[in-house]
């Protein structure tokens, strides 16, 4: 039996939330297991308060707390920045992590990346001595989200009972998150190849300036465009199309090429230290507030959202 466990926990109300998560944390701490708790801001406060009320003097100081609404705003960086970073530092012991990447208020643009994140946990941590427990607010999340959670998790905990999830399928969950990306008519486009990479960056900064990007945000844009366009030239057929537009306070930068994305964990798992390259999408995930990808049969689209104010 694999030591890896990845249950979804469907909760209804604060009492059920605390009744399941607090014992999970305390049992891990009592066993000397490393424990990380990565939850959206309000729920993180609930767990902190609950642990303090149970043990006012110590409150389990060895537990690591992460605000998922900040560190995990872009779902593409949750695996490398939060989950792998914690688990890789504790390889000699069983690791417990609570991770809540989906909550009421996640936008429709963010959700497909959340679903793919949940599916990829199964791939990235297969065979690892890690338990990653994922709470879902069954009172307030749409029914479709709960259905997707059953597809992305091998086990579901609901109403105090743990059951195998019949619909579980990593491939199906990834496919459901692989939504086609359409761009608005007002998007400004630039066709590039290996001789126009510098021009692509210049074009991006010019358009972004017209759209109102702050000066301190241009370096992130320049790095993003450099990584995406270079990736298209090297791996995506030698050329591509760069598009930019604004959505509210976000600058959207998209690159489309004819390359086929063969590795679904690209940009979410650091390559071995002795392997040159392979870190471009990791960097983009760190810079962005959101990264969406669509892998089709005729090409790949990478869409990056950047804060206009940096």
Describe these PLM feature segments.
Residues 1-194, 203, 301, 308-310:
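Non-catalytic sensory/regulatory segments that transmit input signals in bacterial signaling proteins
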Residues 179-182, 230-310:
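Conserved beta-strand-loop-beta-strand hairpin that lines the nucleotide-binding pocket
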